């Protein structure tokens, strides 16, 4: 936001959830300028650029039993109670889908709607969180590597092709891309 306001004090930025099925239309009608999502809509009307990729780790509090294990196994992870972060009431996470492929299931003891509360929950309970390495580092959460072959978490910046030549759109796109690169450090 600092960079945005340094160059343009009259700009307004919003961030909110949108139905995936409505994204292409919302981009085409300029109801949305950009979408950041792990799934690129199937449409010839949009362009995208990968802005984030990170591998999964298992996070826990200081002194947790997992911190005492040198090479954490799948069973070690699955023996734990998990925190699941999702804005949906039910449904699987990418991690759960990958676990099911190899015949495993984790015990989700608590679901919360946002990652903002996750560090406090992890630091004050015995729950573990499977999330990205950058999230663990940014929140100073101890973590272990996962022995699971889980695809990396990827997010894409998505925009409508009609906006390709717009100077303001190009400027904002470049700011967003730089912000994601900075966030992964």
What would you call each of these model-derived segments?
Residues 1-9, 92-105:
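Ligand-binding cleft/hinge of the Venus flytrap
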Residues 1-43, 112:
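Central regulatory/effector-binding core of bacterial HTH transcription factors
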Residues 2, 158-185:
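Extended ligand-binding regions for polar small-molecule ligands
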Residues 19-20, 36-41, 61-62, 114, ...:
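Beta->alpha turn/N-cap motifs
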Residues 43-82, 167-170:
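Flexible hinge/capping segments at coil-to-helix
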Residues 44-50, 54-55, 116-164:
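Beta-alpha-beta core module
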Residues 66-67, 80-102, 165-173, 183:
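Secondary-structure junction motif
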């Amino acid at each position: 936001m600092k960079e945005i306001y340094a160059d343009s004090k009259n700009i307004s930025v919003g961030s909110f959830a949108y139905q995936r099925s409505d994204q292409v239309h919302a981009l085409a009608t300029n109801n949305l300028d950009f979408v950041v999502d792990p799934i690129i809509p199937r449409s010839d009307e949009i362009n995208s650029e990968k802005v984030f990729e990170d591998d999964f780790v298992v996070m826990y509090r200081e002194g947790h039993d997992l911190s005492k294990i040198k090479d954490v196994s799948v069973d070690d992870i699955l023996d734990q109670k998990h925190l699941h972060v999702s804005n949906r009431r039910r449904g699987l996470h990418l991690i759960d889908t990958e676990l099911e492929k190899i015949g495993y299931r984790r015990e989700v003891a608590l679901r919360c709607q946002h990652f903002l509360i996750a560090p406090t929950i992890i630091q004050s309970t015995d729950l573990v969180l499977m999330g990205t390495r950058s999230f663990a580092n940014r929140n100073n959460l101890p973590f272990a590597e996962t022995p699971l072959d889980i695809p990396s978490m990827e997010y894409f910046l998505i925009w409508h092709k009609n906006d390709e030549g717009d100077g303001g759109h190009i400027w904002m796109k470049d700011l967003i891309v730089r912000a994601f690169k900075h966030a992964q450090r």
